[in-house]
Amino acid sequence: MLRSVRSIRPASQKIKSPIRFIGPMKLIYVAGKGGVGKSVCSAATGIWTSDRGLDTLAFSMDPAHSLSDIFDIELGSQPKLIRDHLYAYEPDLAEEARGFYRRYKNIFTALFGLFEVEVKPEDFANMPGVSELIFMDKLNDIFVEKKYDYVIIDSAPTAMVLPLLQLPSITTGFVTRVLGMRNKWIGIMNLLEKGFGDSILNEIRTMRVKAETMRNVLLDPKTASITVVTIPEKAAVEESRRLIETVESHGVHVSALVINHVIQECDCQFCQQKMASQTSYIQDLKSRYQEKQITILPDYGAEVKGDRLNQVAEDLYGKGQMDTV
């Protein structure tokens, strides 16, 4: 859980209360508009947990693959140990799609054949909803493996993903679409179960169980924490509001809100005007989301990568050890 901030603080003042993970929480999902600092917050969270001896996987769902740049290390399609207790992973969607298609070839052959549609494996990755299904499957495997204490999800920008909940004007990211995808897939699976043999039925049931497992993980605040990152500007604030409302309408609780790139000291008139505008948006967010943990991060004034992540981790979570419950 992120530290709570009740007022805008000068950059030099540290917030003392450390992060609190309650019970067996395993998944920290970081969401928000593109360009607000999700990847930096994801990476800094991984730094903080791994520094406390917790095996952590930072898992990028962003096609831009910013984690490589932020950690200043080349990452690939397999988890890579980048420092003690911290692994990072940037899966290649095309490669994962080929593997996923091979894994469930019988299901997809039956499904596409039912509608007399021929789909080549190389075209599979571009189909709506496939990337979410692949990530769901991959996350399920990670949870079953139980190798890591925490999995940090650096999500794709909400405006870059195709919603599966009939919400064309609101893109809500992986969490919401997994929940909606479940209902669509159950209808298709029920249809397939009437016309195919035991081997396909078993594969269908396996996929259904995985969808149910990840749904239960996302709905349980003891196993998942959703953090929304935003900046104090109109477009970002409005998209964050829609994201939170849509996700929570499906039973997934957003526990924390990070307000990034906040100007805290300025001399020029332009900066003072911008700071006044930011203050207005910050106060609105604090008023609207009083029940959530709200953290304010300063504008660091330079690119955050490598060793600078330690400062962000401290600003997010403090210097202390993890609280116990």
What are these regions (language model features)?
Residues L2-I22, R215-V325:
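C-terminal lobe/tail of nucleotide-utilizing enzymes
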Residues F108-F112, E116, V209, T213-N216, ...:
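N-proximal short alpha-helices
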Residues L133-D137, D141, V209-E212, E238, ...:
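Short, contiguous clusters of charged residues that form electrostatic/catalytic patches at enzyme active sites
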Residues K16-V36, V40-L165, S169-R205:
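Nucleotide-state-sensitive switch-loop elements of NTP-binding domains
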Residues I200-M214, A236:
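C-terminal-of-GTPase-core extension/linker across diverse P-loop GTPases
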Residues V144, Q166, L179, E212-R215, ...:
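Signal for well-folded cores of large energy- and translation-related assemblies
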Residues F135, L167, M181, K210, ...:
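Alpha-helical structural motif
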Residues A11, T45, T49, T56, ...:
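Residue-identity detector for threonine
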